[in-house]
Amino acid sequence: MSNRKFGMEGFGINRQTSYSFERSQAPQRLYVPPSSRGGDNSEDADLDNIDYMENEEAEEDIEEGGSAAASGGEVDEIDPLDAFMEGIHQEMKSAPPPKPKEKLERYKDDDDDPVESYLKAKKDLGLTLAADALNAGYNSDEEVYAAAKAVDAGMLDYDSDDNPIVVDKRKIEPITALDHSSIDYEPINKDFYEELESISGMTEQETTDYRQRLGIRVSGFDVHRPVKTFEDCGFSSQIMSAIKKQAYEKPTAIQCQALPIVLSGRDVIGIAKTGSGKTAAFVLPMIVHIMDQPELQRDEGPIGVICAPTRELAHQIFLEAKKFSKAYGLRVSAVYGGMSKHEQFKELKAGCEIVVATPGRLIDMLKMKALTMMRASYLVLDEADRMFDLGFEPQVRSIVGQIRPDRQTLLFSATMPWKVEKLAREILSDPIRVTVGEVGMANEDITQVVNVIPSDAEKLPWLLEKLPGMIDEGDVLVFASKKATVDEIEAQLTLNSFKVAALHGDKDQASRMETLQKFKSGVHHVLIATDVAARGLDIKSLKTVVNYDIAKDMDMHVHRIGRTGRAGDRDGVAYTLVTQREARFAGELVNSLVAAGQNVPPELTDLAMKDGRFKSKRDGRKGGKKGRGGGGGNKGVRGVDFGLGIGFSSESSRTPSSKAAPSRSGAINSVRTGVMAQFKNSFVAATPSNPQNQAYPNKRPSLMGFVSGGTIGGDMGRTQSQAPPVAPTQNASSHNSSQNHSQSSENRPRERKRRSGWDN
């Protein structure tokens, strides 16, 4: 055994100078090259081929030791392990140090920690989205939707200062519109309506009176008369059975006028109060339209496309469409966010005749090639104003660009801002506008009760006191403006043994659908929700709506209370709690109650008078001031006397200060009446002078002339002699030209295709 010393410089080798050979083979022959030894070494040929000495210095030491042994007869012992380790040590000394990896060096930088940077970016993104939602005026649920859409769509970019900004990719990456001129579409039939004798036999005056009773106003060319029963529409026995199964006794106002127009293949702009039955007005004609088309082949469909702004409304329309489609075995698919894209993809790939979707998810499915619009010919945009308010205009345009130009397009909504009308003109062809009631007006079938309370602290005790009586009448829907308030009300009502459920944006789609299903089935009697449930929620057992918090605007208020009093049910009641600090909303609420013919409590009027704008307008209506807004002639919103409500008397409001007003207003009305009569005669001179005394033939030809949406009544039949004598010379010339036009029109064949008043 050798004595080894280990130092920092490596292995040290100390050996004795002589060695006594007691074995038959010398150990050094394994490590000395054959060239340095004499004799035959064939027995060790396999060992001689192994290069143990890779270091040149080690080889020199061995050669010197070998020669010394040969000459002096004495050989130094070389331990194999020591030699091997010495070679490794020398290699380590001569090898260059390894280069540090760039990635590892970057991770060692404390100022650029990837985890810290990621968390910081996420935090900045959340702050940016919150600021955008605040600036956009979103409510609690819309804020959730906006943030989710931004994150899901990857709508994140950075400015020059590396601040995260939200970029709406809907405007950057729309679906390219199809080149319809290069596609050979199969011709389709859109006109399936034939008037029955009971409808075609109505005179113009009878039609006008009937529309007045329904509160219908129409504008457009060749407007069909409204029907009175579902049988007047000519539906098949299968559809009539489905209608009776749903307990539909008679059509609502919007259905009376819209059904014959849609069945005749015309585009429609339908504006009706919430809960008026708009869904059936476009679903029933859609089924007739689809049944006239050839059956779908593999990888074809849909034929009917319905777009809605929210998941809840899309699901509600989906359920309604399934009820009526079951009679013919038509397949209906619902496509909206919150559900599995994979499952929706498979369902669409299997084929369907009707698809109900939100615009965003439908765009996703189109990009995934889950469906094609080559067979689509019936498009419905429901709650169109809400879609445009939520920024869905690019998606709507993209969807429209995928559907054939000669499609039938229907646009239904409860309100119709000017920007929506402008867009409607671009995507609709020669539409007929049907308005039931005032645009954006609350449903008159709903009894509205307003309670003015000192502060928010009195809301919960009031609800706990009134809720048992409300539940006795039916289910109750409570609206709150914040998610935290919803959770608080749910907890308090649960402690008081009420069967309640909550619905807001923080709950996932599956949970929300389960909550709605339990509420509809009677498991829960009270539903507390934010405005996410305000649109499209149709529950027949719902009798009471409570506005625990006021809505953000009157349009949302109208949609909230419209969840009760559905389809003409006059038993609905809507309660609204208003605090002393909500004077501005109180003024708007007074105007809404007046327009709907509801009672205005004095305490609400007193609160509204604290709002400067409302007070100045009211003073202006009274005519007590000569300045801005004065001389209003005691007229309120939409020309309704201020204070009109239950028990209001117009005579009691007259004051001596307004005696001079009638002469001025009478002159203005005379001029207005003369201009309107002249305008209408230029359009309807082709009709007989006395339509009241003449009955129409059994098979009514399409009406000629434009029906103005400015009036409800039958002013069109008024003769020129009834107009006031404003500018006699001009009126006489206009009257003569109208008569000449009438004579020439009677001899000229009627053309169905004419430019409408909607064309620019």
From Swiss-Prot:
Q: Which PROSITE patterns match?
A: DEAD_ATP_HELICASE, HELICASE_ATP_BIND_1, HELICASE_CTER, Q_MOTIF
**What InterPro entries does the record point to?**
DEAD/DEAH_box_helicase_dom (IPR011545), Helicase_ATP-bd (IPR014001), Helicase_C-like (IPR001650), P-loop_NTPase (IPR027417), RNA-helicase_DEAD-box_CS (IPR000629), RNA_helicase_DEAD_Q_motif (IPR014014)
Transmembrane parts of this sequence: none
Please tell me whether the keyword Isomerase is annotated for this protein: no
Helicase ATP-binding domain location, by residue?
259-434
Which protein are we looking at? DEAD-box ATP-dependent RNA helicase 24
Residue ranges, compositional bias (Acidic residues): 41-64
The keyword Heme is assigned to this record: no
List ligand-binding residues for ATP: 272-279
The species this protein belongs to is: Arabidopsis thaliana (Mouse-ear cress)
**Which Pfam family is an annotated match for this chain, by its short name?**
DEAD
Concerning CDD domains, the annotation shows: DEADc_DDX42, SF2_C_DEAD
